[in-house]
Every structure is written in C-alpha cells, then in structure tokens.
Design a protein with these regions (language model features):
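HTH-adjacent hinge/linker in prokaryotic transcriptional regulators
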Residues: 22, 26, 31-76
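Short beta->alpha connector loops
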Residues: 83, 147-151, 224
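Phosphate-bearing ligand-interacting subdomains
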Residues: 11-16, 120-201
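Conserved mixed alpha/beta catalytic, RNA-binding, or beta-rich assembly cores of soluble enzyme
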Residues: 92, 99, 116-127
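Glycine-rich adenosine-cofactor-binding loop
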Residues: 70-112
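Extreme N-terminal segment that seeds HTH/winged-HTH DNA-binding domains in transcriptional regulators
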Residues: 1-21
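Short, low-complexity, charge-dense intrinsically disordered segments
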Residues: 205-213, 220-229
C-alpha cells in the first residue's frame, strides 16, 4: 500500500502543479493509468478523504499522504559505496523533492577516502567510521551500493548503530533484524520479467497493474573466480 501511496502522491503533485483543485478517483485513475477501486480502498484504509459529489481536494489529499508517508519531516541519507552507482545516487536531485538529503558517502577505497566527489562535493568517509558519522550527521536512512559479498556485513554495521531504514542496491537478498526495514532495488529481475514478456507469442503492450508490479529480491550471484571489487 505504501508503494502505491507514493505513486498517488506523485500524481497529486502533478495535478497541483497544473492548478487542478479537485479530482475524482475515476478521473485520477484514468489520467494516470491507475485502478479507481484500488485508490479508494487504499485511501479508505487511512481515513475518509473524499467528498461526495466533489471527489478529492488535491492539495488536502496531497498533504495527508505526505504526512502518512512521513515526508513532512526531513530525512538524512548516507550512501555506502562511492563507485559509479553510489556517486550517481548522490548526484540525483530528485531526493530533495521528497525531503531526503544525502549528507555522507562511505567507501573502503583509500584513493577515494578524504576526497569530495559528485555535484554536491560530498566528503567520502572511511566505511570503518560509519558509526561515528551516522551519529554526527544524524543519518536515519542508509543506502547500500556495494558488491554482493560485502552487503550483509555493511548492513550489520549500520544496524548495530540504530539504523532502521535501508535501501539496498547490492545484488543479493539481505537478512535484517526485527524492526529494521530493508528495501531491495532489483533491476535484473525486472529486466528478466520484460524478457519473458517479449519471448511470448502475441505479446502486446500491457502495463502491469500497480499492485502486481513488485518483484522478488533476487539477483544472480557473481560468477566463481571473478575479481573482487572495492566499493
């Protein structure tokens, strides 16, 4: 449900920017290729937001969903892994629109530690200093962008100092303790799903319903004997 709320919020932001004041669930569904019944069910779980004969007040609903998702308060983000992916994530300016600010990068490469990289000129810290920097920078969300073999160890490190929200880009499923949420971004499985679709006879342009578009957290492992890489 929370993933769909994020999509609704993006849609409502677009409507608000366009100056639209009210919208029905049906119109919202048609305009953004959503499911009107699912919209009503999801929103009904959190309260009564619609007005009979009017629909939803765009600005009010946007503000409610922002609070439900906890986006009315700022979040400070650290990224472990200052390679191409980690640097690209640090440079992404879309996080700020959702009240996330990347404040620190970490790596184990001595040639990167102590240098400032990316558009924001973020200092790359030694990953061994992650506990101290998390406390000093008041980081509450960590992003893991390291090779698969290092990911669980890195997760254990950040969990040990109280981090409860982790976005994982490493190609491996991770084990988290109770009370810690790990969200894995699985690009390979999504591409494999598209490959399956293309391989079927009479494939047509079908967009999966939002509620069915989640994928499992599995990546192929690095082949045996592959060279270890720093992060």
């Amino acid at each position: 449900t929370t993933s769909r709320l994020s999509v609704y919020l993006r849609c409502l932001n677009a409507l608000h920017a366009a100056g639209i004041k009210t919208i029905s669930s049906q119109a919202l569904a048609e305009q953004f290729n959503l499911n009107s019944a699912q919209i009503r069910k999801d929103l009904g779980y959190f309260g009564e937001f619609g007005v009979r004969g009017v629909g939803y007040y765009v600005e009010d609903l946007r503000d409610h969903i922002t609070k439900i998702l906890g986006l009315d308060s700022p979040h400070r983000v650290g990224i472990i892994g200052a390679g191409r992916l980690g640097t690209a994530l640090a440079n992404y300016n879309g996080f700020g629109r959702s009240n996330f600010t990347v404040v620190a990068l970490f790596d184990n490469d001595r040639q990167k530690i102590g240098h400032r990289i990316g558009d924001a000129k973020l200092l790359v810290h030694d990953v061994d200093d992650v506990a101290r920097v998390i406390r000093e920078e008041a980081i509450d969300v960590m992003v893991i962008a390291v090779p698969a073999k290092a990911a669980q160890r890195v997760l254990n490190q950040v969990m040990s100092v109280g981090i409860k929200a982790v976005l994982n880009f490493a190609p491996v499923s991770l084990t988290a303790r109770r009370g810690v949420k790990v969200k894995t971004v699985d690009l390979t499985t999504s591409l494999e799903s598209l490959s399956y679709f293309l391989s079927q006879p009479q494939s047509s342009a079908i967009t999966e319903p939002l509620s069915q578009s989640r994928s499992k957290e599995n990546f192929p492992q690095r082949r045996k004997g592959a060279k270890a890489e720093s992060f």
